UniProtKB/Swiss-Prot annotation:
Name the record gives this protein: ATP-dependent 6-phosphofructokinase 6
SUPFAM superfamilies: Phosphofructokinase (SSF53784)
Protein source organism: Arabidopsis thaliana
Active-site residue list: D221
EC number annotated for this UniProt entry: 2.7.1.11
Gene Ontology cellular component terms for the protein in this record: cytosol
Keyword Hydrolase among UniProt keywords: no
Amino acid sequence: MASNGVDEQIKLVEGPAGYVLEDVPHLSDYILDLPTYPNPLQSNAAYSVVRQYFVDEDDTVQEKIVVHKDSPRGTHFRRAGPRQKVYFKPSDVRACIVTCGGLCPGLNTVIREIVCGLHFMYGVTEVIGVDCGFRGFYSKNTVALTPKTVSDIHKRGGTILGTSRGGHDTSKIVDNIQDREINQVYIIGGDGTQKGANAIYKEIRRRGLKVAVAGIPKTIDNDIPVIDKSFGFDTAVEEAQRAINAAHVEATSVENGIGIVKLMGRYSGFIAMYATLASRDVDCCLIPESPFYLEGKGGLYEFIAKRLRENGHMVIVIAEGAGQDLVAESIEQQDASGNKLLKDVGLWMSLKIKEYFAKHNVMDITLKYIDPTYMIRAIPANASDNVYSTLLAQSAVHGAMAGYTGFVSGLVNGRHTYIPFNRITERQNKVVITDRMWARMLSSTNQPSFMNPPKGTTEFTD
């Protein structure tokens, strides 16, 4: 029997010394007298040697680990992992997986490990993949997924299920979940996708359905808050090195050579910052969070000329969302997911630098522009991201089988946790330019901060 309380997703449990647990919803919150079953892992020979494999219900993970001695204990999240009791009989489980939004290294690994985790750890045999994002739910496009069909997909880029932006119709999606008798839904996507997943969870709860909704957060830009990082990010940074290395070779092979590399980062410059730190060949890194200006004392043009006179070459890394206020009126258009369409700041920057140096007869330059954006996101995950994606997928499976719903699995301070949907969709994670990591990057490039444009120049307004 179902109870009311669709909006009761935020579950706060308070304890002594300022302890707060931001708990995730559970099927038992709105369905009474749910039966439980022994976890099949108890009889799984592979796990018989693992001591204390099951997670204690009281285990939580602290959100902030750097505190003062008198600070309150702060916010915690429920620790991820298998429980001794599960709320689904494996023979009754009919699970589905959907991928939405842009591509990202590791998508196929997550798909594979959800399928294999359900099958080998819990004995679930019915798993289907939903084709091409949310709209696949109501366009009748599905594919059967078995350990055999997904055995080597982690070696490929992209997603075997296809993906799309938009197409979210909550009522139609839940109607089809109900019609197909699906009782576990795994949704892989970014913040927009997880907002859609939250809407699906709420509608399922409103209808009183025994359906667990689990999210695996995905963004190559690493702009999802709370979690340590997104899967695919390490691969993206590693692959970005190839473009930066090529730009460095081009720049050093000619007199006054400039190499410009545009990397992904619509609103957050993490890929650009970490790729710059990893490369050590970059002279200037420009990201959306750090304003800059072009002309005048201390501007970008002056810095480029200075660096060329000193070294005879220069490499610039720019995130796709950097300097949009400097670009001629940005277009007021959005993609199907509601993301603002940006002008190509890398191409614009290349043209502006060429024009300035020619117009002012500063010096002859040779400029090469490299845009590896889609190459970076379309490759398979590296070893680190494959392991990370595996653990995220397995955590989601453990959570759904244990009856949790309306959550994403994520790494917080090195521990896998279950996080309420609202916590990862309420804001975007951004580079903090007053933080140590940005200072480390500045010390690597020795670039100016560009924070104080002189009078008479065009200022960047945040």
